[in-house]
């Protein structure tokens, strides 16, 4: 029973602090107006209507925009893709380009 009191007290204090913390879970409040939390910013993405060719869509931003993240590798054009046909007329695609990590 004596172990239960400190445990309950710790849980109660943490619950009170979680409710009273300004700015939410990941953002501190510096006297600015409160903005809604944007999960796209956590992944260092940009909210846009359409992603650019070197970006991928990962999440959905507020106002039904797309969260566009930059790719870490550069994708080359499709000119480096070879098409080989076998005797059964099945198409097999081989990518001959090499990717380099930045």
From Swiss-Prot:
Protein name as catalogued: Beta-defensin 116
Annotated region (Disordered), positions in chain: 83-102
GO biological process: defense response to bacterium; innate immune response
Coiled coil: none
Gene (UniProt): DEFB116
Taxonomic placement: Eukaryota, Metazoa, Chordata, Craniata, Vertebrata
Family listed: Belongs to the beta-defensin family.
Top-level division of the source organism's lineage: Eukaryota
Classification via InterPro entries: Beta_defensin_dom
């Amino acid at each position: 029973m004596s172990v239960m009191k400190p445990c309950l007290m710790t849980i109660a204090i943490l619950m009170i602090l979680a409710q009273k913390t300004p700015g939410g879970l990941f953002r501190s409040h510096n006297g600015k107006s409160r903005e809604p939390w944007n999960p796209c910013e956590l992944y260092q993405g940009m909210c846009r209507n359409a992603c650019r060719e070197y970006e991928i869509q990962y999440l959905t931003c507020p106002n039904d925009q797309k969260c566009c993240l930059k790719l870490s590798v550069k994708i080359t054009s499709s000119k480096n893709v070879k098409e080989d046909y076998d005797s059964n007329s099945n198409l097999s695609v081989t990518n001959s380009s090499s990717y380099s990590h930045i």
